[in-house]
């Protein structure tokens, strides 16, 4: 908050003092005494000058002789003025007293003016010259701005770290989903491998069964061949030559042997061909499954390494985020302490400014009192000079006396201009000015 106090301006207005100033003259002849003068009041209250004993002219002055309650005072030309010499002497004494008082007050006024000027020179720059405070305020503004920038930078870094952590979390979740999918594929391939192994074992068992059956068939065939040969041999000994020519058993056996051998070879070839095709198919599938399994294992190891690196990076980002949050809390704490210190400094400066204003007002009031007293004394001196100068006319009116006693009533206008500025992040967001006139 910056506040400035405008310089004082003095407006002097002239008006009759009939309402604020009165000259009371009373007398009882022939007793004479010196006058006692009292100065009081400031500005509009004026000063009252009373003379307790002053020579008048018989009953023409009306006993009391109150100038404040009459509009005019008429001096009768037929009245006899006695003791004029004593009256003039009394007036001269009073005039000398007034002149001495005026000189004394002028000297006191000059001394007070010098003191006021010195006080203004000493205290004035501290009130109006805010260069020292502006330097401190500028440094504090720079510090606040730097702190705000650092705070914004830290907030941005925290946001970036949070976004990076979110990205890594998304990547980690995606990689985890891929890993789970690969694991499920590997489990499926393992089931396929198990099924393939079972099929291979079944085929091998079937091949063994077929081999045993082939051996059994060969053995039976040999047994049948041997039995047939024995039968043929036994039958050939008892052949009746006269019997009609029968079927050639050797040819039949050869035909049967050829048919059985062809059938056996065909079955053997079909079995071997089927076995080879199945074995080749299972070998191809096994190779493919092995390659897929190896690829899946490689991908799984890569995914594990990537997940491990992502977890390490995530932990580092978490630790960096925690450190940044700690730094942010420390910065906010320092910022709050600095703002509290600045608030205390501003309050102290405002208190000093209020004290300076109070001192200035008090000095101004003292100056006004002295100035009013001086001007009233000058007005009274002018009035007495007018009275001492004498009038040739027989009539002296109170209006003439009051017209000679017109003085300028001093009015002091104090204008206080208070400018309030609201700062946010080193920038002025609100500016208001209040002017107060006293």
Swiss-Prot record:
An example Gene Ontology biological process: intermediate filament cytoskeleton organization
Which residues lie within the region annotated Linker 12? 229-252
Any one GO cellular component localisation term in the record: keratin filament
Q: Which SUPFAM superfamilies does the entry link to?
A: Intermediate filament protein, coiled coil region (SSF64593)
Q: Which Pfam families match?
A: Filament
Q: Keywords of this protein's UniProt record, alphabetized?
A: Coiled coil, Intermediate filament, Keratin, Phosphoprotein
Q: What GO molecular-function term can you cite, just one? A: structural molecule activity
Cite the record's tissue specificity text. Answer: Expressed at low levels in skin.
Protein modification: Phosphorylated. Proteolytically cleaved by caspases during epithelial cell apoptosis.
Region annotation (Head) maps to 4-83
Site (Cleavage) location in chain: 242-243
The IF rod domain sits at 84-395
Q: Where is this region: Tail?
A: 394-438
Residues of the region (Linker 1) are 120-136
* Location of region: Coil 1B: 137-228
Instruction: Enumerate the residues marked as the site Stutter.
Output: 335
- List the residue ranges of the region (Coil 2): 253-393
* Region (Coil 1A) location: 84-119
Signal peptide segment: none
Question: What does this chain do?
Answer: When phosphorylated, plays a role in filament reorganization.
- Partners and quaternary state? Heterotetramer of two type I and two type II keratins. Keratin-18 associates with keratin-8.
Q: Which family does it belong to?
A: Belongs to the intermediate filament family.
Misc remark: There are two types of cytoskeletal and microfibrillar keratin: I (acidic; 40-55 kDa) and II (neutral to basic; 56-70 kDa).
Q: Could you identify this protein by its name?
A: Keratin, type I cytoskeletal 18
Species this protein is from: Protopterus aethiopicus (Marbled lungfish)
